[in-house]
Amino acid sequence: MRLCSLLLVCALTTSALAAEPALVQFTAADVAAAGWKPYATKEGITLDRRPVPGTGFYEHRAVVELPVPPAAAADDVWRALRGGDMATLKRREVLAESPTELLIYDQIHTPVVSDRDYVIKVTRTYDAARERTEFRCTSVSGVGPPVAAGHVRIPIIRAGWLVEPGPAAGTRLTYYAYSEPGGLITALLARSAQADRSLADIVHMAKRLRRLSPGDLARRD
C-alpha cells in the first residue's frame, strides 16, 4: 500500500509540472537534425549536447558500444541505479520499490556551490519487439523528505539509460541527461559542470559493464 500510494503521488506531481522542457530523449525526434553537436570526448566516448528551447541549458547524450549481452547490461544498469553507484552521492534513501520502479531520495556533493538533493522516480521498461530496455529517471515533487539543511533542491531532472542490441551480440548503451540545478546558479555557470558530470557518468557506467565477469554473463544468457 505504501508503494502504491507513493508512486501514485509521483505520477500526479510529475504530470502537474507546468514547464516541461522540450527534450528529445527517448523519442523519435532524437535524430541528427535535432541539433546535437559534439562537446567532448573521453576514453573514446563522445558527449553530444543540444540547446533546449526556452531554457539556458543543454540536453546531453552519449552512445557507446559494449561487448556485453543486452540482458546482462540491463540487469547491471538496474543494480547501479538501485545501489547508488555514483561518485558524488552523500546519502541515498530508497523510499519505495517494485521490480520496475524505484522512488529515491538523494543528497549529492557539488563543488563550490551548496550541495543538492532531489527525489526521483526511476522506471524500467522493456520493449520485446525491439529488444531494448529503457531506464527513465524523473524528478518528482511533493513526496519524500523536505529539502535538507544546507542543500538546494534540484527542481528538474530528466535522464536515463537505453540498452539495446549492438554489433556482434553486444550492447549499444545510450545515456541521456538534462537537469536544472535550482538555487541562484545561472545557466552559464552550470553548463560546463553539467556536461562534465554527464560525460563522467557514461564513462563510469561503461567501465562498470565491461567488468562484468563471465559468470555474470553466463547467468543472464
Language model: regions and residue ranges:
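Bacterial N-terminal signal peptides
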Residues: 4-15
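Eukaryotic helix-grip
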Residues: 19-221
